[in-house]
Amino acid sequence: MYFKDGFRDEVAIIGMGCSKFGERWDTGLEDLIIEAAFEAFADAGIGPKDVQVAYFANTAAPNNCSGTPVADALKMHGIPITRNENWCTAGHIALINAVLAVKSGMCIPAMAI
């Protein structure tokens, strides 16, 4: 999904986080999400309670993780968390949905996980 004029002057990425790379077979999916999310919160200077909507990218996780366990782990209750599953492009789809949510005026900020 591409837009002719883009959103350069209207939407910004204010924070970014990433879980540590490596063979971490003993680390669960939710722990990896928490690690990346709290790094992004610190980078943006916001907390979980500031997020108004979130889009969770899932790539065929064996436990079929929905947005609800993520909401519980991040203490992000009372907001919509939409799960996107689209194999290798799941993260891209989550980011596009977060951009569209902000662009539409639905919320500020949105989060792509």
Regions found by a protein language model. Give the residues of each.
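Conserved "HGTGT" condensation-loop signature of ketosynthase/thiolase-family condensing enzymes
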Residues: 1-83, 100-104, 111
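Cysteine-centered functional microenvironments
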Residues: 80-93
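Conserved phosphate-binding catalytic cores of ATP/NTP-utilizing and phosphoryl-transfer enzymes
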Residues: 92-100
